[in-house]
Amino acid sequence: QNYAAKKGILCLMDMGHYHPTEVVSEKISSLLCFYDKLALRVSRPVRWDSDHVVIFDDELKEVAKEIIRNHAEDKVIIGLDYFDASINRLVAWTTGERSMEKALLYAALLPNEEMKKLQDNAEFSKLLYLQEHAKMLPFDAVYQEYLTRQGLEEDYFTPLHQYEEEVLSQR
């Protein structure tokens, strides 16, 4: 038993603090077997104290797939790290938030139930085919519709840059 289990507290997986060959996504399904809830600190692992802004990269997509495939949307508490001393914090925050949303949407759009069935039936050739096919599904069109329904523009940089020039620079 680890410290969190002994103390009855949440186990926190901090994506920014693992060996470069280790990834958090590979640990999620195992931890969910032992914990009712799991906390994630999602960041981009960089080996110095800057540039931790979350981006829509392969590991973020894998983390989201683990959450969605394990039906753990209510079991995994997601905290995002936006620290980067060299860029506008509002841009960092919005980039990170939208990247996490994209990853979860991407994972939710995958044919997860069909892939599970193929895995369970040892139909690995068809599973490989489906996994590769899924990479080209029209994710962006669905994301654009999501933004429209939320009343959001895809371009968040322009208004944030304008705010930086007109408001933040005056402080």
Where would I find each of the regions flagged by the language model?
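Active-site-proximal segments of catalytic enzyme domains
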Residues: Q1-N2
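Histidine-acidic metal/acid-base catalytic patches
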Residues: A5-M13, H19-R171
